[in-house]
């Protein structure tokens, strides 16, 4: 089994030979031959080895631009100090010591709280460890104090014997925050019947942000 990671616009492809690297199934593989993939921070500088950053890529088959959309094209491009052109993917990732790329989150979903990057996927993974949680999505909402603060929308498990063991929102909040770093702690938890999703199953986090009233 061979898995490919890339964009329709080009900008670099990663390949994972799953049968050859069973210990790397959590990654999207390594850059294909002739493809250059790098990670950059919010300022556009390349990140240090082992650090997370936005995935940008260069490949022989990159698009020249979006048709009649020069501004959108410029927003999608990144150039290294030597003038080499890359395409921004919008994904946040990290390379391991062997050069395998792990995707962490989407850049648009990154929460910047008190000047620190908070990755929703990290918080979601913790909440999914709770036996009463069936599904979860974490979003950043405006905060006068922190700029943004994380809020979790949680779908509780249903079924025989589940109703009596369902946690209250305050109980679940305390449980989660005791397992998170101080800078990651959730502001609140909202229970929801189901997460809004697109036709292809992606969680519509914009709708969740719109549902929540900004905290102080």
Protein language model regions, located:
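AMP-binding/adenylate-forming catalytic core of the ANL superfamily
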Residues: 6, 57-59, 64-65, 79, ...
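Acidic/polar alpha-helix N-cap and adjacent early helical turns
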Residues: 210-216
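Short beta-strand-to-turn element immediately C-terminal to the catalytic PLP-Schiff-base lysine
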Residues: 14-18, 40-41, 58, 155
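Beta-strand->loop->alpha-helix junctions that form or flank phosphate-binding loops
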Residues: 2-9, 28-31, 139-142, 190
